[in-house]
């Protein structure tokens, strides 16, 4: 089922411009970011922040695709309002999780975001609309079409 899509050597994809590992461990393992491996008791959680790259229609994408199971999922979102993406991985037994998080801020906290001019604030009575779409892929052809929008696996 779809709950197993992340198992058995699934791959992660993202339309992005820049990557910012959030720790020394994340920096040291950046070459492994796109691979999803079986549970490992020694695995330590790591996170990567990204600035996304929009397509011609203004959308960015992140996918988790598993060719072996011929299943996958893609999150599609507007890059003008959700211009960043956080990827969090913990592939440890009992804590086996991947977070695919379109967002408008990095995970470094409000103070650092304010310091870098990245803190998004709404004015009183202001509202903002966000667009997010979840796509489920079933079968080899749907996976091929989903993977074609990327330059390659993370």
Q: Where would I find each of the regions flagged by the language model?
A:
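Short, small-residue-biased leader/transition segments that mark boundaries at the very start
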Residues: 1-6
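Active-site/ligand-binding surface loops and adjacent short beta/alpha elements
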Residues: 7-79
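Active-site pocket scaffolds in enzymes
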Residues: 68-154
């Amino acid at each position: 089922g779809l709950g197993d899509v992340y198992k058995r050597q699934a791959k992660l994809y993202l339309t992005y411009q820049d990557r910012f590992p959030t720790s020394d461990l994340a920096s040291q393992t950046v070459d492994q970011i796109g691979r999803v491996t079986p549970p490992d008791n020694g695995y330590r959680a790591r996170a990567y922040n990204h600035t996304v790259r929009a397509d011609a229609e203004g959308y960015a994408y992140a996918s988790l695709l598993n060719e072996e199971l011929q299943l996958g999922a893609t999150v599609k979102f507007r890059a003008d309002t959700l211009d960043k993406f956080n990827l969090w991985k913990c592939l440890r037994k009992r804590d086996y999780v991947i977070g695919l998080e379109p967002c408008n801020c990095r995970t470094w906290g409000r103070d650092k975001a304010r310091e870098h001019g990245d803190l998004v604030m709404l004015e009183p009575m202001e509202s903002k609309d966000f667009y997010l779409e979840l796509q489920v892929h079933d079968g080899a052809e749907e996976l091929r079409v989903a993977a074609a929008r990327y330059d390659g696996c993370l």
